[in-house]
Each structure stands twice: as structure tokens, then as C-alpha cells.
């Protein structure tokens, strides 16, 4: 018998003899795999079903997120299947979490369409999350190779250009979300924008669910908001903005609203995460082409990012959104009302801002990541924060952040402008103390009290909110160190 025929017969007997072969034996498990610089790497937290071997579970994830199906198929012989099969190459037990494992998986770059978040996610978080062999599955982190990153636009504007456009350097930007988020008329909505900006804020913002409802249509909102922006800019001499939410039912509607926001002079527009990855990338390309800052509200993310054993970690969304091309994304506050472990939040901010990431297990960063000159994304901190926390916000979050005080501005007893002034004075006093070399974290409450002696709105705010905080145990915490929720 011809040798090539014998070889094919051997392959058939070993590889295709039975209809169902364990994934590990099909080539989806390779502990000796040599990782290539062009490989896409993913780390999954796996909870196998009782009786399922962790290695087989990892191999199954690799198979189902790349080329495999439930049975052997002959058409594998028509492809470079050894190349295209994802390889699970490492399985580690999760510290202090029995029955959970970290599975490291490598994917060849040719498995993914260039510049497409939708195609990347269709494999990585596709059918595999419903696979019966695993009780729960969570995507914890990814390494995106430089060769693949270079096929993405990255942030439309970026932190550096945004600061130049705002003529604002050396401090966090200040913002607020219009409240109540639903129900205001266009004229009253615009008045909120004007009062907040005149009081000292840099930005006002639409909330995630204000689009074009019967009580206020989008065009009316845009016109009244920009009237407020222009009047506040003229009176203050500062560059001001308002995030005009262009989220809509179709891409045609979103483009129409975005074009109108540009026509009326806005420097920034806004979209929601729920519009989907393709729509986000489309709007990012529009924003780059039209020289607009693009703000992304992460509406909906906690439906799949909050639980620790299933879904995906928000740091992965941060990476995808930096690739997709947004300029802002809400990334947590540590001290506010929303989920936020200090180390996890630090990892999110570093993912958005740093040009290069090293492995940092306490912050949940499992891979080294070179961002290949993609611009930085400005993190946004919002949700339950107020001026009495200013020293902690600066300490935790740094200068490259937008601090969004919604209720902490509009809930001020003396009015919106007074609330904005309280936040601006609190920020300026803390930065002055820091620049003077004082321990602004330890002395923060006293610094605020001293500043309030000459600022009535700040004193009123401190009296009202005092040291109110939201001290609940975070559901998403580090696996490698103990990180109690910030007690602030």
C-alpha cells in the first residue's frame, strides 16, 4: 500500500474512528504550545460541571470558540485545522475558589476579521457560553496582538487632543448628568445645562435613556442644550460642552442626530453601549471623520460583567472599546453608589490610559499588553459621588478622568449653579493643596472645610452630604489579594 494512503488510513483510524472524541484528544489541549506574538490570548474563569475534567473543559472552550462542533467532521481535512484550532495551553486553579479554574487559550490571528469587534466577539463570547460541559464561564482578560490592534482605528479624539480642545490641563474635568433623567421639557433641560456650566463645570451630560421621547424630542433638546452651552461659554470665557446622546433605533437615525449635533456647534456627542459593537465602531469612525469627541455610556454592562463566575469582566469591555474608538467610557468611582472594588477599578483605568500594560494579578491584568500607539480613552467616574469625597476621588482616580456629579450638583439646596460651584471649588482647593506638597488625602476633610469658609455653596454641600458613602461588599474583587471595599 502506498505510504501516503497508509498515513491517511492511520489518521482516519485515530482521528475519525468514533463520532465523538474528547476535545483534548482532538487537538484543543496543548500544554507545550509555543505562543506566537500574533496570537490572540484569552483567559476564562471556568466552573466545570461535576465530573468534567478541568483540562477537558478548557479544551472544549477552545474548540467551541474556534473550529469545533460536537462531533468529528470530515471537512476538517479540507482546512489547515491544526493551525485554526484554538489551543488551551494552561489550566490553573482559582485561589480560594474551589471548582473554579483559569483556562488560558490561544487563537491564531487569522481566525478574526481585521478591524471587527463583532467578529472577534462572535468567537470569544459566542455559543461557548451556553455549553453544557461548563456550569459557568467568565471571560476575564485578553491579550490583543499588535498586528491585530493595528487594524483598528482606536479612540476618535483621545485624551491629549481633548485636553487641547478644552484648553484644560493638569486637573480632572468636571461634569454632571442632567436630573431628573426623564420628564423635563426642552427649555427646562437647557436651563439645567446652562446653570451647571455657568457654575464651573466643564460638561453637562444626557443620561443613557434620554433619546427622543414624547415629553422632549431630540432636536428640541439639542437646540436648548447648545443655547445653554454657548451662553455659559460666553460668560465664563471657558470651553464648555454637553454630551448630546444620539442613541436611536437605527444607524440612519443616529447619523442624522450626530450630524445635527455638529451643525449646532457641539464638540461632543454620546452613545450607549447597548447599541452594539458594530454601531459603536460606526459612530467612532464618524466621530474621527467629523472631529467630534465620542462619549460612551456603559448602559447594560452589568448584566454580564457584575457576577464573578459568569459573563465577562469589564476590563475586557474597556479593551474592546479602546479598540473600537470611543473617547470616554464610564469606568467606576470606587467611592460611589455603583459596583467598584479599588484594585479592579485601578485595572480598568490603567487599561484605558496606559500605552503598555504589564501583568498585574491584583488588578486583574493577566497579560502584558502593548497598545501599539492607540490613543487613550478618558475614564468617566459617575454615580453617587459628591464634593466631600474630592480628596478620595483624586487619590484613587488621578487627573485623567471626568468626575460626573449628577445628584451631587443638581441636588444642592441652593440650586444647580451653587452645586456646580461647590464641586469646582472643592476640586481647585484640593489641587492647590496637592501642588503645595500637602498630604491632601489625610488632610482632605480639613482642606474642604477651610475652602468652605469663603464659599457658601461648598459649606452647604458639606453640611448636607457630610460623609455619606455606599459601603457594600463588591461582587467583583481580586483573586490574588484581599481588597476590602473602600471604607470612605
UniProtKB/Swiss-Prot annotation:
GO process terms (BP): reductive pentose-phosphate cycle
Pfam families: RuBisCO_large, RuBisCO_large_N
Residue positions, PTM N6-carboxylysine: 205
Class of this enzyme: lyase
Protein name: Ribulose bisphosphate carboxylase large chain
Cellular localisation: Plastid, Chloroplast
Cellular component per GO, a single term: chloroplast
Catalysed reactions listed for this entry: 2 (2R)-3-phosphoglycerate + 2 H(+) = D-ribulose 1,5-bisphosphate + CO2 + H2O; D-ribulose 1,5-bisphosphate + O2 = 2-phosphoglycolate + (2R)-3-phosphoglycerate + 2 H(+)
Subunit comment: Heterohexadecamer of 8 large chains and 8 small chains.
Note: The basic functional RuBisCO is composed of a large chain homodimer in a 'head-to-tail' conformation. In form I RuBisCO this homodimer is arranged in a barrel-like tetramer with the small subunits forming a tetrameric 'cap' on each end of the 'barrel'.
EC number(s) reported in the record: 4.1.1.39
Statement: the UniProt record of this protein carries the keyword Chloroplast: yes
Amino acids binding Mg(2+): 205, 207-208
Active site (catalytic residues): 179 (proton acceptor), 297 (proton acceptor)
Site annotation Transition state stabilizer: residues: 337
GO molecular function, one term: monooxygenase activity
Keywords: Calvin cycle, Carbon dioxide fixation, Chloroplast, Lyase, Magnesium, Metal-binding, Monooxygenase, Oxidoreductase, Photorespiration, Photosynthesis, Plastid
PROSITE patterns per record: RUBISCO_LARGE (PS00157)
Cofactor(s) the record lists: Mg(2+)
Cofactor note: Binds 1 Mg(2+) ion per subunit.
Residues annotated as binding substrate: 127, 177, 181, 298, 330, 382
Organism of this sequence: Porphyridium aerugineum
Record bears the keyword Magnesium: yes
Alphabetized Gene3D superfamilies for the sequence: Ribulose bisphosphate carboxylase, large subunit, C-terminal domain, RuBisCO large subunit, N-terminal domain
NCBIfam families noted in UniProt: PRK04208.1 (NF003252)
Coiled coil: none
Function: RuBisCO catalyzes two reactions: the carboxylation of D-ribulose 1,5-bisphosphate, the primary event in carbon dioxide fixation, as well as the oxidative fragmentation of the pentose substrate in the photorespiration process. Both reactions occur simultaneously and in competition at the same active site.
Amino acid at each position: 500500500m502506498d505510504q501516503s494512503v497508509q498515513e491517511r488510513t492511520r489518521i482516519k483510524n485515530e482521528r475519525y474512528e468514533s463520532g465523538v472524541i474528547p476535545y483534548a484528544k482532538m487537538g484543543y489541549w496543548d500544554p507545550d504550545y509555543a505562543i506566537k506574538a500574533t496570537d490572540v490570548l484569552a483567559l476564562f474563569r471556568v466552573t466545570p460541571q461535576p465530573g468534567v475534567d478541568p483540562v477537558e473543559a478548557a479544551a472544549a472552550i477552545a474548540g467551541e470558540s474556534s473550529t469545533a462542533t460536537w462531533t468529528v467532521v470530515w471537512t476538517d481535512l479540507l482546512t489547515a485545522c491544526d493551525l485554526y484550532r484554538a489551543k488551551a495551553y494552561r489550566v490553573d486553579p482559582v485561589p480560594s475558589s474551589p471548582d473554579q479554574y483559569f483556562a488560558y487559550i490561544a487563537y491564531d490571528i487569522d481566525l478574526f476579521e481585521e478591524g471587527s469587534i463583532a467578529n472577534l466577539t462572535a468567537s470569544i463570547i459566542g455559543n461557548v457560553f451556553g455549553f453544557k460541559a461548563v456550569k459557568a464561564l467568565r471571560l476575564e482578560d485578553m491579550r490583543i496582538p499588535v498586528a491585530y490592534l493595528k487594524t483598528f482605528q482606536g479612540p476618535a479624539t483621545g485624551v491629549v487632543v481633548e485636553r487641547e480642545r478644552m484648553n484644560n490641563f493638569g486637573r480632572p474635568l468636571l461634569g454632571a448628568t442632567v436630573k431628573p433623567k426623564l420628564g423635563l421639557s426642552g427649555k427646562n433641560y437647557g436651563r439645567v445645562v446652562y446653570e451647571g456650566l455657568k457654575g464651573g463645570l466643564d460638561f453637562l451630560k444626557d443620561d443613557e435613556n434620554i433619546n427622543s421621547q414624547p415629553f422632549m424630542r431630540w432636536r428640541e433638546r439639542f437646540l436648548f442644550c447648545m443655547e445653554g452651552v454657548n451662553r455659559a461659554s460666553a460668560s465664563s470665557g471657558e470651553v464648555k460642552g454637553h454630551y448630546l446622546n444620539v442613541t436611536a433605533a437605527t444607524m440612519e437615525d443616529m447619523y442624522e442626530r450626530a450630524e445635527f449635533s455638529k451643525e449646532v456647534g457641539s464638540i461632543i456627542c454620546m452613545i450607549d453601549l447597548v447599541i452594539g459593537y458594530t454601531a459603536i465602531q460606526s459612530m467612532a469612525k464618524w466621530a474621527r471623520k467629523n472631529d467630534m469627541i465620542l462619549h460612551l455610556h456603559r448602559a447594560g454592562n452589568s448584566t454580564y460583567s457584575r457576577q464573578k463566575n459568569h459573563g465577562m469582566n469589564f476590563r475586557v469591555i474597556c479593551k474592546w472599546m479602546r479598540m473600537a474608538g470611543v473617547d470616554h467610557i464610564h469606568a467606576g468611582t470606587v467611592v460611589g453608589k455603583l459596583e467598584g472594588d479599588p484594585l479592579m477599578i485601578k485595572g480598568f483605568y490603567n487599561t484605558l490610559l496606559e500605552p503598555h500594560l504589564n501583568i498585574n494579578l491584583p488588578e486583574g491584568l493577566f497579560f502584558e499588553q502593548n497598545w501599539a500607539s492607540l490613543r487613550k480613552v478618558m475614564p468617566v467616574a459617575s454615580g453617587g459621588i459628591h464634593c466631600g469625597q474630592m480628596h478620595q476621588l483624586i487619590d484613587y482616580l488621578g487627573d485623567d478622568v471626568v468626575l460626573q456629579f449628577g445628584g451631587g450638583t443638581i441636588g444642592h439646596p441652593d440650586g444647580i449653579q451653587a452645586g456646580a460651584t461647590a464641586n469646582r471649588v472643592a476640586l481647585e482647593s484640593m489641587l492647590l493643596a496637592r501642588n503645595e506638597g500637602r498630604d491632601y488625602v489625610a488632610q482632605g476633610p480639613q482642606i474642604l472645610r477651610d475652602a468652605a469658609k469663603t464659599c457658601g455653596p461648598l459649606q452647604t454641600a458639606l453640611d448636607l452630604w457630610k460623609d455619606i458613602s455606599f459601603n457594600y461588599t463588591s461582587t467583583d474583587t481580586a483573586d490574588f489579594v484581599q481588597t476590602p471595599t473602600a471604607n470612605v
